[in-house]
Amino acid sequence: AHLHEMMALLTDPTLSFPHGEINDLREALSRIRIEGLFMDEAELFSLRKMLDYAAQLERFFAALDKTKYPLLSNSSQSERPVSNNFINDMISAIDKIIDRYGKMRDNASPELARIRKEISASQGSVSRALNAILRQAQAEGILDKDAAPTMREGRLVLPVPPAYKRKIGGIVHDESATGKTVFIEPQQVVEANNRIRELEGEERRERMRILLEITAKIRPAIPHILSTEHFLGDIDFLRAKALFGLDMQAIVPETTKHPMLDWREAYHPVLLLNFRRQGKTVVPLTIRLSNSEASNSPTGRPIGGTPSNNRILVISGPNAGGKSVCLKTVAMLQYMLQCGLAVPMNEASKMGFFKNLLIDIGDEQSIEDDLSTYSSHLRNMKHFVRYADAHTLLLIDEFGTGTEPLIGGAIAEAVLAQLNQQGAFGVITTHYSNLKHFAEQTDGVVNGAMLYDRGQLKPLFQLSIGQAGSSFAVEIARQIGLPETI
């Protein structure tokens, strides 16, 4: 319901959703629980931006039309964990010491203002003295015309050729990698540079005092700040899900507590997005699986006369005809729903929930575990038989393959019979005729065919429930040009 409202809100032309910054401050907040530790300027700046975003969201949600967005308009009161006063007071306290670039203000305290003013004056004095020495040295030919003061080890120095280093008295702090330049601090500015170093130490101590002071104000509110961060994360996640749903033109479908599938024009999300970029059209999937109890409920809606107690769909048809895509579409969309995402399908669709999703897709053979393709499938089937029940959705691709067809088909049929007896739901793809016959004769199991255009010898990628499909092996062999004699 929250997702449905968020999707509607984001497409409302009268509204503009606030944008802000959410930073993970859990580590910093955990650290400052200890007395004597503090948040640095960058962390305070991040906290300020996060609190400002929380305030924006509070105002935005509070102003929403409560009849149109009942859940989101109430989230500001029911979910936001701190008051406006707290947020405003905290932002004001941070703004007094941190500027809009995230740096500590000169006037964060009178003492800091004095120190920085003296540092600036001392640096100006050193710079003027160095420039005077530099001009004299250039006039005497000791230094190049393009030479300029530079910084080494936090002190202003002059770049001097080694041959002239004794002509400029002072302290050598460094030399270039080539050895063609030494960096000298002239004796005339040593005392001033020393004073600058002392002032920088005073500045660090005053900055630390200021940070400790504001951290002491933040410390009691740590639980509230963490709750605010969690709330912002929830809102951001909800917005991300809504944007993803809107990009797919997805819906939040009608749902029911009991397991069932009643899908109209459903799309695999990856195919949908990729084909859209390529200007292609995806063939949608319509499918219904339910047991008789669910389907006899007042809200049951059969599709095209499909029997209401068909829980397991056995899909057959040609290779590259769309069997696996149907299977993966069911797997993907069901998992998306149960993760709280919108799903791309027609609004007339209805979805149920499953406690277990058991999937056997692909080849899991392993040299390390001494498993062949067939052994890996059998191991999965053992797991399925053990855990499948009436709240389970099975998704099995190429059921029974990987061994001698006669034996593999027989084992697959026995496993399918057991899974059906346990009341499981499922979508299964196969080429085995015995499984098609089993589906035709067994209550709870139904055939599905991937349609094929015999005239043009090409798959239609459409699922038809209630009939078994053909592999069209002869037609495909003829199409690719195998000799007629074969």
Report the location of each language-model feature.
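Extended, Lys/Arg-enriched charged tracts that mediate electrostatic binding to polyanionic substrates
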Residues: R114-Y164
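Conserved amphipathic alpha-helical "coupling/scaffold" segments
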Residues: A1-E111, I115, A221-H224, T228-A242, ...
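Long, charged, glycine-rich C-terminal linkers/tails
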Residues: L134-R152, A242-E265
